[in-house]
Amino acid sequence: MNNEAQITSNTKYTIKVLKLALTNGGVKPPSALKRGELITLFVGSGGIIDKDGTLFLKNTTESEIKFQKPILKWVGGKTQIIQTLVKYFPPEMENYHELFLGGGSVLLALLTLRREDKIKINGKVYAYDFNEALINVYKNIQTNKEELFDALTKYIKTYDGIKSNETPINRKPKDITEALQKKENYYYWLRAEYNKKYKDTNKDAVDCSALFIFINKTCFRGMYREGPNGYNVPYGHYKKTPTFITKSELDKVSDLIEDVEFIHQSFEESFENIKAGDFVYLDPPYAPENSKSFVGYVADGFNLKTHQNLFERTKDLDKKNSKFIMSNAKVELVTESFPKAEYKIIDVTARRAINAKNPDATTTEVFIMN
């Protein structure tokens, strides 16, 4: 079999290894494999993996689908490994459930595949998150995209119009005049306005969503973290003006998510909606390697008990005859909860941009599937 051979899903082949290559997702070939060696491989959609899931030889005759880019930056976002991840999605499902929506890159990829007739969804698409402000952003993209874009554009134009000067940084400007002295001042002014509006007005207001998007793009590496007084992530100090979504891109996203049901609720409640034949993707706050791991996604965070509860509920999906894929860190808590004898585990190398000292640092993640 060579690069021109027709690749058939769910079939085993014995081939002579001619070339080793990494995919964009960074799945590494085993170091023991050598050119000229005969090896039996399990063939998956669009490529080949060995029985342990460690080798991926891409089918070079199949071009990658260009997925819609997400609107938001998000810690732990899957944009960099999305081409690898979606290869493990089932080609047909009853309903799709995404329990930790975040930046939405996986949801947008799935919807792109559905539009291109690569995946068939017989029922509905559900997207859940415990972050109410985030869910409201997507709802406003669905129903109020024109007003949302106008409000966001107002903040962007004001931000772009602020020129550099020698005025000292003021992280607590008392009024708009002080806020307009520096871009950093303006960020903190809008952050305070967001926290005030989110607390005192309708949380689903278009202006709250516009502020959410603006702050997300100008804060430190797309983090979302809440404290007692609300959103508290510092300014991002980007050398170039961050790239905000264009009107045409917003229209594309709005069209893609038109029939998605966005739901603000806990993952415990979300599991109750899953039925036989459904497919579930979970990308929770990652299980920690140590006490410094980032878990401040929402005000009360994820603790050990929360992770264990999530893992048990995920494993119960077997009893419902539902398929799932979970992304998580390759740490002891995860690997012991999902033994290889019972679940398929795929190792993936990913960049962890939350690292302040080394933003290009990488780590090993896992895809867990039943």
Give, region by region, the residue ranges found by the protein language model.
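S-adenosyl-L-methionine
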Residues: 54-97, 105-106, 358
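Class I S-adenosyl-L-methionine-dependent methyltransferase module
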Residues: 113-258
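Long, positively charged, glycine-interspersed low-complexity recognition regions
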Residues: 287-288, 297-370
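A structural motif corresponding to the C-terminal end of an alpha-helix
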Residues: 246-261, 311-325
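Conserved proline-anchored active-site loop of SAM-dependent methyltransferases
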Residues: 85, 96-110, 127-132, 138, ...
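A mid-sequence, solvent-exposed acidic-amphipathic segment
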Residues: 248-276, 280-281
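Basic helix-extension-helix modules of the SAP/HeH family
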Residues: 1-57
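Mobile active-site "lid"/loop adjacent to the S-adenosyl-L-methionine
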Residues: 226-240, 286-307
